[in-house]
Every structure is written in structure tokens, then in C-alpha cells.
């Protein structure tokens, strides 16, 4: 165990001097003697000096303090003892429920599975949310991004997905809260506790108030726990299907930007770190399915200033199988979930995967909505009366489709008072098929708003 001393502190960046013969390796964890502070080596500056980033607050540190090298990367507890617990970036419990009872630990920096070990899957994961199941279906073992600006419902959508998938899915889940609000983390904990699935979820939080080093590594901590669950073999030699929720992947990038500037790297476009694509790749390449088990990940992605071409969301796009884009325009018109049916995509929306009927209905729905979008300008200038009869029909159907995409959520029940609805895929397809065929042309459009399946629409219309 080599030891050195602190020679410089600039915010979260600390320079430590070691003997030239015992300089720690990149990503080794160092412990500041007499404190709880852990440092991670980022650069070797020469002459025995290493530049490190602190994984916690640097308050109370001063030059000359002794630092001991652990000669290993940061490692965190893994296995079933982590379930039902809330941990920080170093795997220390922060839920005041005693230590995490496991001897097994893994380093947070690991290689992604090789090409030979990876396996793709086309099994669909039903979410019970109509617009997602119809237009951007999720794959088991796939990666999904929820893109949206501030306040359009990323976290609520993610909570509903957790509610619908994690509860129905008997497997294990890991939730990584990266640079988000502590209140949301607290809500999530109580939500899981109340629905009796807490014993199947491990939670890792590095929230907004944490230093950048902490927020930069907390996603890797959560991922390491998920990888262990995926790779742990049962008696038949099979791994597990694990769910990994990350809220919010943008804050991971942002923490990287803060660290990069502190380390003195030249910024690239829009002030992001020059290693943006590589850092994102290091995380995303590890979130994958192998021949023995799978990780299905759902990631919230904050979109700065609602600009999808910003380097951070643009880099994230490349790694995903399905993208769910939340739109401010749709949210402002009162339709929730505010998912943009024309912008959201999925690699699974293919007749060979979802079947010919589902594919054709999804594309027909998008065609109607696209035509309505084109007609909006004409309507704004000339009014509805100037449209051809068939265009009027398109408009009426499109407005019904838009309203039918809205759906009351279980997690929003406390705010709206409307009980949440979970719609099976077969019901969703049946409803939209009838809508396109004109079977419900006689029903007023308000009957389609905030309901579950098509049978509820008919029942609601009778009361109007």
C-alpha cells in the first residue's frame, strides 16, 4: 500500500504526490487518511504526481494530508444483499438500514462483453401504454431512451414504465438516479415499498447536490450491479433478465463536462468534453444482452433547450433500439403521455418482428397524423370548410387518434384522481384498427380522451 500527500486542491480535482516508484494506475481508488473521502486517479502528470477526482465533498481537506492507494479501482457490493437498499456511488448504504451484508464486490470499471458473447433478441416487452406499444415497441434486452426537455414528463413516464414492467416482470431491477432530484429518488423508494416490489430493486443514487466525480461514476455503479445479476448463473446455467433504469443519462454527460474542464482538457462543441462519444460508449456498450442473460435498459435523456441536435442527446441516439420523444406542443395541448407519434421510433417496428397487421396499423396511424399536420396550415388560413370531404375525414380521425393516445397513469393517480389504465397490445391494435376503418366516426372526439381501451370509449360516449 503506497502512500502520498496532497499538494493541490482545485474544487473537486486533487493532485497527489507519490514516490516515483509507486505511482498508482489510472482509475485506481485512493483513500484520504482520517476522512471518508475516496479519490479516483484520472491523469499521471509525471514526477510522481497524479491528478485525481474526488468522489465526495472536498470540504475540510488541506495540502499535506496523507493519501493511501488501494491499488485497485473503486469496487461496489453486488448480489442479492443489494436488493431493497439505497446505496451511493461507492456502494455505501444511505438508507440507514445497516451495512450491506455481502462479501462479494466488483470493480466499476470492466470490459464490455465481447462480440462472441453478445446476443440480440426480438421478443417484445409489453408496456401497457398504447402509444408506445403501437408505434415504438420495446424489445426485451433492448435499450430505450425517453427524450424530452424540462417538465414534459420524462420521470413520470419512466415511473409508469417501472410500475407496469417491473411489477409484472418477476426479475430484478436496478435503478440508477444520476444527478436528478433527491425528492424523486425518495418518491421512487416509497412507490416501490408500497407496491411490495422493493425486495426486487437495488437503488443507487448520486443526486444533483453531489460533486461531479460522484455523478460521473454512479451510472457505472448501478450498471455493475445489473451486470452481476445478468451474469449470475442458476442451476441450469442460465443468467437473468434484468431491468436497468437510468434517470438521467444527460447528467452523466454533464458531470463528464464538469470533470473534463477541471482536468484542463480543451472543450469541444457547445462546451462538451472532447471525449463525449467515447465516455457515452464506455457506458452504453456494457448495457447489453449476452447468451446467458439480458439487460433491458430504460434511460431518461434530458434535451437541453428542446434541441435534439445538441451533442449530448445526439450521441445518445446512436446507442438506442427505441426512442420515445416527448413533445412540449403535445404536453401543452393536454395530451399525456406527451409522446410524439411521428418522432418516436423503434427498430422493432418491423413486420417480421411485430407481425404484418400491427405494422400496417402503426404506419397507417402515422400517415393520418402526418396528413393532419400538413393540413393544419390550410385550416389556419382558410378554415375547415374549404377542405375536401376526404381531408375533413382525415382531420376528424387524426384528432380522435391523438386523444386516444392519451391515457391515465397509475403513478399520476394521486394528482389526477383518475385510476390508471394498462392496455394490452391486442386491445390497442383492435382499437386503432376500428378507428382507421371508420367504425367509430360517429363517436365525439372527447370520448377518446384519457381512457384505456376502445370499449371504455364506447361506454364514455354513451354517457355524453
UniProtKB/Swiss-Prot annotation:
The lineage of its organism: Bacteria, Pseudomonadati, Pseudomonadota, Gammaproteobacteria, Moraxellales. One of its GO terms (cellular component) is proton-transporting ATP synthase complex. Produces ATP from ADP in the presence of a proton gradient across the membrane. The catalytic sites are hosted primarily by the beta subunits. GO terms for molecular function: ATP binding; ATP hydrolysis activity; proton-transporting ATP synthase activity, rotational mechanism. It is found in: Cell inner membrane. This is ATP synthase subunit beta. InterPro entries: AAA+_ATPase, ATP-synt_VA_C, ATP_synth_F1_bsu, ATPase_a/bsu_AS, ATPase_alpha/beta_chains, ATPase_F1/V1/A1_a/bsu_N, ATPase_F1/V1/A1_a/bsu_N_sf, ATPase_F1/V1/A1_a/bsu_nucl-bd. It comes from the Bacteria. Its EC number is 7.1.2.2. Belongs to the ATPase alpha/beta chains family. ATP binds at residues 148-155.
Amino acid at each position: 500500500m503506497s502512500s502520498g500527500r496532497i499538494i493541490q486542491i482545485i474544487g473537486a480535482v486533487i493532485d497527489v504526490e507519490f514516490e516515483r516508484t509507486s505511482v498508482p494506475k489510472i482509475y485506481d481508488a485512493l483513500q484520504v487518511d482520517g476522512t471518508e473521502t475516496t479519490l479516483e486517479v484520472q491523469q499521471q502528470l509525471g514526477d510522481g504526481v497524479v491528478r485525481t477526482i474526488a468522489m465526495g465533498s472536498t470540504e475540510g481537506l488541506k495540502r499535506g494530508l496523507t493519501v493511501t492507494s488501494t491499488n485497485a479501482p473503486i469496487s461496489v457490493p453486488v448480489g442479492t444483499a443489494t436488493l431493497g437498499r439505497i446505496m451511493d456511488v461507492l456502494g455505501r448504504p444511505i438508507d440507514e438500514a445497516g451495512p450491506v451484508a455481502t462479501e462479494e464486490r466488483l470493480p466499476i470499471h470492466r470490459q464490455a462483453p465481447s462480440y462472441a458473447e453478445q446476443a440480440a433478441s426480438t421478443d417484445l416487452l409489453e408496456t401497457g401504454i398504447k402509444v408506445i406499444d403501437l408505434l415504438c415497441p420495446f424489445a426485451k434486452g433492448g435499450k430505450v431512451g425517453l427524450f424530452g426537455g424540462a417538465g414534459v414528463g420524462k420521470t413520470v413516464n419512466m415511473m409508469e414504465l417501472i410500475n407496469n414492467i417491473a411489477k409484472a416482470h418477476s426479475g430484478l431491477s436496478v435503478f440508477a438516479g444520476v444527478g436528478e432530484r433527491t425528492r424523486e429518488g425518495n418518491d421512487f423508494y416509497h412507490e416501490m415499498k408500497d407496491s411490495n416490489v422493493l425486495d426486487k430493486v437495488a437503488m443507487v443514487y448520486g443526486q444533483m447536490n453531489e460533486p461531479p466525480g460522484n455523478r460521473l461514476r454512479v451510472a457505472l455503479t448501478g450498471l455493475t450491479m445489473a451486470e452481476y445479476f445478468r451474469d449470475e448463473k442458476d442451476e441450469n446455467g442460465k443468467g437473468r433478465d434484468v431491468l436497468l433504469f437510468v434517470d438521467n443519462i444527460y447528467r452523466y454527460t454533464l458531470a463528464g463536462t464538469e470533470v473534463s474542464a477541471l482536468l484542463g482538457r480543451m472543450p469541444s462543441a457547445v462546451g462538451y468534453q472532447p471525449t463525449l462519444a467515447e465516455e457515452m460508449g464506455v457506458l452504453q456498450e456494457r448495457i447489453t444482452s449476452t447468451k446467458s442473460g439480458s439487460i433491458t435498459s430504460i434511460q431518461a435523456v434530458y434535451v437541453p433547450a428542446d434541441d435534439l441536435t445538441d451533442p449530448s442527446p445526439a450521441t445518445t441516439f446512436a446507442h438506442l433500439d427505441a426512442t420515445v420523444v416527448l413533445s412540449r406542443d403535445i404536453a401543452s395541448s393536454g395530451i399525456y403521455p406527451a409522446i410524439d407519434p411521428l418522432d418516436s421510433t423503434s427498430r422493432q417496428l418491423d413486420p417480421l418482428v411485430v407481425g404484418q397487421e400491427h405494422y400496417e396499423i402503426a404506419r397507417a396511424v402515422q400517415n393520418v397524423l402526418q396528413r393532419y399536420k400538413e393540413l393544419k396550415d390550410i385550416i389556419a388560413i382558410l378554415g375547415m370548410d374549404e377542405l375536401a370531404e376526404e381531408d375533413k375525414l382525415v382531420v376528424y380521425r387524426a384528432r380522435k387518434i391523438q386523444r386516444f393516445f392519451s391515457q391515465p397513469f397509475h403513478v399520476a393517480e394521486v394528482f389526477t384522481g383518475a385510476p390508471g389504465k394498462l392496455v394490452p397490445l391486442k386491445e390497442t391494435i383492435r382499437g386503432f384498427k376500428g378507428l382507421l376503418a371508420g367504425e367509430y366516426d360517429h363517436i365525439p372526439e372527447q370520448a377518446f380522451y384519457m381512457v384505456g381501451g376502445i370499449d371504455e370509449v364506447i361506454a364514455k360516449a354513451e354517457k355524453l
